[in-house]
A protein has these predicted regions:
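Ligand-binding cleft/hinge of the Venus flytrap
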Residues: 1-9, 50-52, 75-77, 86-108, ...
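Start-of-domain marker
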Residues: 1-23
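Periplasmic-binding protein-like
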Residues: 8, 56-58, 142-178, 180-188
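Short helices/loops that flank or line small-molecule/ion binding pockets
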Residues: 20-32, 48, 111-133, 138
Length: 188
């Protein structure tokens, strides 16, 4: 995203916040933030989406000593999974969570879920596999890497987008390929 904005003589500033806060900041009309990323596409009136900017393999982190066995998504209902509050997963999984058929524990971050899985407090956690690999390289989480693995089956390969506030300004930034002057806005 940074390179695309620079090619268009625009300045992109990226700040990092907990997921729920990032979404709230991007949705607020008075905020300095016009959007957030990465996001999976979902139906909403609050945001509009860029063209896909990448792919995120959505899977499950589990303990090596207690792998989760499943063939169909509904098979996961036998397990308690960690999810991150306000994350969009897949339509099918989110329906199971909303209906109560999928036991879950919500956390505020993927890092919290990784720690819960490693401690055996939950059976697994739904996570973007690229995020998992990045987090397990962080010094404070490296000791957990030997206990954990990615489940053999992915939930989905999801396209990633930038979500822009659904306003005239948001549409202008989404359509940044038509630059007319230098702007500076922020993404979370």
């Amino acid at each position: 995203a940074q390179a695309a904005f620079e090619r268009m003589e625009q300045q992109l500033v990226v700040d990092f916040y907990p997921w729920s806060r990032a979404i709230k900041l991007a949705a607020m009309p008075s905020s300095d933030y016009i959007g957030y990323f990465p996001e999976y596409y979902f139906e909403t009136d609050k945001f509009i989406f860029s063209k896909p900017i990448g792919i995120g393999p959505l899977g499950i982190v589990e303990q090596k000593s207690r792998p989760i066995s499943w063939h169909h998504l509904a098979d996961l209902n036998r397990y308690t999974l960690g999810i991150v509050q306000d994350y969009v997963n897949t339509d099918s999984l989110d329906v199971m969570i909303a209906s109560g058929s999928q036991p879950v524990e919500a956390a505020t971050s993927d890092e919290q879920n990784i720690k819960k899985v490693a401690a055996g407090r939950i059976d697994g956690a739904v996570i973007d596999i690229n995020v998992l690999h990045y987090l397990l390289k962080q010094p404070h989480l490296q000791p957990l890497a030997d206990k954990l693995q990615v489940n053999r089956q992915l939930i989905a390969n999801k396209q990633l987008y930038v979500a822009f506030r659904n306003t005239e300004e948001g549409r202008r930034w989404r359509d940044i390929l038509r630059p007319s002057r230098k702007h500076k806005r922020r993404l979370v």
